[in-house]
Amino acid sequence: MATLLQIKSSLFGDNGNSSQLANEFVERWKTQNPNGEVVIRDFAKEDVPHLDATRVQALFTPAEQRTAEQQAVVEYSDKIIAEIQAADAIVLGVPLYNFGIPSTLKAYFDHIARAGVTFKYTETGPVGLLTDKPVYILAARGGIYKGQPSDTQSRYLVDFLNFVGLKDIHFIYAEGLNMGQKDQAFASAKHEIEQEIAA
C-alpha cells in the first residue's frame, strides 16, 4: 500500500493557498492510489515546538540518561522522522512569508536534522541518510519570485532536503496571487499537478 505524507505549513490551515494546492495534489494522488494512505501534518492545528537549549540537550543525551521530559522530545523527533521514512512520497504546501518558509516548518526541519540519524559527516562532507523519494513542493506566493535572486526560499528547501538525503524534488509554483493572477496561477499549478501525478 502506497503512503503519502502531506505537510501543510500555512498559518491559515486549509484556507491557505499552499494548503489548497497541496489538498488538490492529495485528491489527484488518491485517484491513482485508491488503497493508499495519507498521513497529514497540519501546522495550523498542531504545536511544532521550536528548538531551544533544553530540547537540543535532550537530543544529545544518551537514552539511558534521559529524563521523562527529554525522552518525550526525542520521541517527537523520532516519530516525524519515521513518518518521512515510511512515506513513498511527500507533498509539502509552502507559502512564502517574508522571503522565507513559515517558522513552524523551520522548527519541523530542525527536529528532523539529526546527526547520525538523518545525516552524517564524512571526510568528503555531509551525507544524507534518509531514503530518497519524490518530494512535491506546492509553493504559493503573493508576488513573483521564481528564478529571481530574491527567491531564497526555493534554494533553502533544496539545500535542506538534499542535506538529509531527499533529492527527487519537484516544485510547482503558484505566483502573483496578490497581483490579480490567482485564477491563472491556480489553473497552471493544477495542470502541473495533473502532469506530475500522471508521470
UniProtKB/Swiss-Prot annotation:
The keyword Ribosomal protein does not apply. Quinone reductase that provides resistance to thiol-specific stress caused by electrophilic quinones. Its cofactor is FMN. Binds 1 FMN per subunit. This is FMN-dependent NADH:quinone oxidoreductase. The gene is azoR. SUPFAM superfamilies: Flavoproteins. Belongs to the azoreductase type 1 family. It is an enzyme of class 1 (oxidoreductase). One of its GO terms (molecular function) is oxidoreductase activity, acting on NAD(P)H, quinone or similar compound as acceptor. Homodimer.
